[in-house]
Amino acid sequence: MVGKIIPASNWLRIKRLFKDVKISTQGSRMAAGHDIYAVEEGSIPAKGQAFVGTGIAIGLPKGICGRLAARSGMTSKNGIAVGGGVVNADYTGEVKVILGNHGKGEYQFKACDRIAQLIVEKI
Protein backbone atom coordinates (compact mmCIF):
# COMPACT_ATOMS: atom_id res chain seq x y z
CA MET A 1 0.00 0.00 0.00
CA VAL A 2 1.39 3.42 -0.97
CA GLY A 3 2.25 5.62 2.00
CA LYS A 4 1.93 2.87 4.61
CA ILE A 5 4.86 2.88 7.03
CA ILE A 6 6.35 -0.57 7.50
CA PRO A 7 8.65 -1.31 10.47
CA ALA A 8 11.70 -3.13 9.10
CA SER A 9 13.69 -3.23 12.34
CA ASN A 10 13.80 -1.54 15.73
CA TRP A 11 15.24 1.61 14.11
CA LEU A 12 14.21 1.50 10.46
CA ARG A 13 10.78 2.41 9.10
CA ILE A 14 10.06 2.18 5.36
CA LYS A 15 7.38 3.97 3.34
CA ARG A 16 6.41 2.87 -0.18
CA LEU A 17 6.13 5.98 -2.40
CA PHE A 18 4.65 4.35 -5.51
CA LYS A 19 2.42 1.37 -6.23
CA ASP A 20 4.23 -1.93 -6.90
CA VAL A 21 7.50 -0.80 -5.31
CA LYS A 22 9.51 -3.63 -3.78
CA ILE A 23 10.22 -2.91 -0.11
CA SER A 24 13.73 -3.54 1.21
CA THR A 25 14.39 -6.99 2.63
CA GLN A 26 17.06 -8.69 4.71
CA GLY A 27 18.56 -11.80 3.15
CA SER A 28 18.80 -13.46 6.56
CA ARG A 29 18.34 -12.63 10.25
CA MET A 30 22.10 -12.05 10.54
CA ALA A 31 22.47 -9.90 7.40
CA ALA A 32 24.17 -6.56 8.08
CA GLY A 33 22.07 -4.69 5.54
CA HIS A 34 18.65 -4.50 3.93
CA ASP A 35 18.62 -5.10 0.17
CA ILE A 36 17.46 -2.03 -1.77
CA TYR A 37 15.71 -2.42 -5.15
CA ALA A 38 15.50 -0.27 -8.30
CA VAL A 39 12.05 1.20 -8.90
CA GLU A 40 12.43 1.12 -12.71
CA GLU A 41 14.68 -0.33 -15.38
CA GLY A 42 17.67 1.53 -16.76
CA SER A 43 21.24 1.28 -17.92
CA ILE A 44 24.62 2.73 -17.05
CA PRO A 45 27.19 3.23 -19.81
CA ALA A 46 30.73 1.92 -19.34
CA LYS A 47 32.67 4.32 -17.11
CA GLY A 48 29.41 6.22 -16.45
CA GLN A 49 27.07 6.63 -13.53
CA ALA A 50 23.35 6.84 -12.81
CA PHE A 51 21.13 8.18 -10.05
CA VAL A 52 18.67 5.30 -9.48
CA GLY A 53 15.37 5.71 -7.66
CA THR A 54 14.12 3.13 -5.17
CA GLY A 55 10.53 4.26 -4.66
CA ILE A 56 10.91 4.22 -0.88
CA ALA A 57 11.45 6.75 1.88
CA ILE A 58 12.88 5.72 5.22
CA GLY A 59 12.45 6.93 8.77
CA LEU A 60 15.28 6.81 11.27
CA PRO A 61 15.46 8.15 14.83
CA LYS A 62 17.89 10.86 15.91
CA GLY A 63 21.41 9.49 16.30
CA ILE A 64 20.94 6.86 13.58
CA CYS A 65 21.85 7.01 9.89
CA GLY A 66 21.48 4.71 6.92
CA ARG A 67 24.57 3.93 4.84
CA LEU A 68 24.08 2.74 1.28
CA ALA A 69 26.70 0.15 0.41
CA ALA A 70 27.59 -1.91 -2.64
CA ARG A 71 26.44 -5.46 -3.08
CA SER A 72 29.58 -7.56 -3.35
CA GLY A 73 28.29 -9.62 -6.29
CA MET A 74 27.49 -6.52 -8.37
CA THR A 75 30.95 -5.15 -7.73
CA SER A 76 32.94 -8.33 -8.33
CA LYS A 77 30.95 -9.55 -11.36
CA ASN A 78 30.02 -6.29 -13.08
CA GLY A 79 32.24 -3.51 -11.70
CA ILE A 80 29.26 -1.63 -10.25
CA ALA A 81 29.98 0.57 -7.21
CA VAL A 82 27.75 2.64 -4.92
CA GLY A 83 28.82 6.25 -4.40
CA GLY A 84 28.19 8.71 -1.57
CA GLY A 85 25.61 6.83 0.36
CA VAL A 86 24.61 8.32 3.73
CA VAL A 87 20.93 8.89 4.52
CA ASN A 88 20.47 11.20 7.51
CA ALA A 89 17.64 10.81 10.02
CA ASP A 90 16.09 14.12 8.94
CA TYR A 91 15.93 13.22 5.23
CA THR A 92 12.35 12.43 4.22
CA GLY A 93 12.55 12.16 0.42
CA GLU A 94 12.95 9.17 -1.86
CA VAL A 95 16.10 7.15 -1.26
CA LYS A 96 18.18 7.24 -4.45
CA VAL A 97 21.37 5.35 -5.15
CA ILE A 98 24.36 6.62 -7.14
CA LEU A 99 25.68 3.68 -9.16
CA GLY A 100 29.01 3.89 -10.97
CA ASN A 101 29.93 1.48 -13.76
CA HIS A 102 33.65 0.72 -13.68
CA GLY A 103 33.19 -2.11 -16.18
CA LYS A 104 34.00 -2.16 -19.89
CA GLY A 105 30.42 -2.54 -21.11
CA GLU A 106 26.99 -1.07 -20.49
CA TYR A 107 25.27 -2.36 -17.34
CA GLN A 108 21.51 -2.90 -17.55
CA PHE A 109 19.17 -3.32 -14.60
CA LYS A 110 15.46 -4.03 -14.31
CA ALA A 111 12.77 -2.81 -11.95
CA CYS A 112 12.99 -4.77 -8.68
CA ASP A 113 16.68 -5.69 -9.19
CA ARG A 114 18.73 -5.44 -6.00
CA ILE A 115 21.06 -2.45 -6.47
CA ALA A 116 22.51 -1.72 -3.02
CA GLN A 117 22.18 -2.53 0.64
CA LEU A 118 21.16 -0.17 3.42
CA ILE A 119 23.09 -0.58 6.65
CA VAL A 120 21.56 1.13 9.70
CA GLU A 121 24.19 2.58 12.06
CA LYS A 122 24.43 4.56 15.28
CA ILE A 123 26.32 7.83 14.88
Locate each region found by the language model.
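DUTPase catalytic domain/fold
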Residues: 1-123
